């Protein structure tokens, strides 16, 4: 993701005009109030209400699309302006799916999709496509097809080699823990999820949930 951020910042795809992104996972059980089956043999199990209670920020948006939007804002630096969202509700009243349209500052448009209906054992996926007036960037985290590809209008193609298996399922807690220790020790570090990124993510999802209820376009 940091490499994608560098490519966009270099100007190789020009001014961003449109972003389309999707995030999918196997979490229908959680959003209907059933404990996560993958945690059956764990000592500490997450409370299902964390994801299924609408009064506790339950739902696919807060539970999963927070990751999607944070990643998108990290690499694009866009600022949200207006949001419209439709969803499929779970029995507990939270969102199983999200179909979100965005208008960013400067007139950039975006289409964003979230879905909890991936079959168990598959893992789901996460991809970001950024289209500019000089080219496009394709970033895919789905397991066994990870890629970072840049194509420009003048025929350039940059294909960053990614080792198979380094996508969505390669994440561990080791790097965040190491970073926290570095901060405590006063060492230099790079914050890949700073407050500006997270603020834009919260503004976007807050507007999306307001739009679900109002069925209208909402200001982010």
Language model: regions and residue ranges:
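Predominantly a Rossmann-like dinucleotide-binding segment in NAD(P)-dependent oxidoreductases
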Residues: 1-84, 91, 215
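C-terminal glycine/acidic-rich active-site capping loop/insertion
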Residues: 35-48, 52, 82, 126-200, ...
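Hydrophobic side-chain positions on well-ordered alpha-helices
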Residues: 7, 182-183, 211
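Contiguous beta-strand/loop segments that form the cofactor/metal-binding neighborhood of enzyme cores
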Residues: 63-145, 174-188, 207, 220
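C-terminal hydrophobic helical "lid"/dimerization subdomain
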Residues: 196-213
């Amino acid at each position: 993701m940091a490499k994608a951020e560098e490519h966009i910042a270099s100007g190789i795809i020009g001014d961003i005009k449109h972003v389309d992104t999707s995030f999918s996972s196997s979490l229908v059980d959680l959003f209907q109030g059933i404990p996560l089956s993958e945690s059956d043999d764990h000592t500490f199990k997450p409370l299902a209400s964390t994801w299924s209670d609408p009064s506790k920020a339950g739902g696919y948006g807060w539970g999963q699309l927070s990751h999607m939007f944070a990643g998108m804002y990290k690499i694009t630096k866009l600022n949200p302006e207006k949001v419209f969202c439709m969803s499929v509700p779970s029995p507990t009243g939270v969102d199983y799916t999200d179909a979100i349209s965005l208008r960013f500052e400067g007139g950039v448009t975006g289409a964003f999709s979230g879905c909890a209906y991936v079959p168990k054992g598959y893992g789901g996926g996460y991809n970001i496509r950024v289209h500019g007036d000089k080219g496009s960037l394709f970033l895919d985290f789905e397991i066994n097809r990870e890629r970072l590809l840049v194509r420009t209008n003048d025929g350039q193609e940059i294909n960053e080699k990614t080792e198979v298996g380094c996508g969505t399922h390669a994440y561990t807690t080791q790097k965040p823990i190491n970073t926290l220790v570095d901060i405590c020790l006063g060492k230099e570090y790079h914050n890949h999820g700073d407050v500006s990124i997270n603020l834009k993510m919260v503004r976007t999802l807050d507007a999306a949930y307001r739009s679900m209820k109002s069925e209208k376009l909402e200001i982010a």
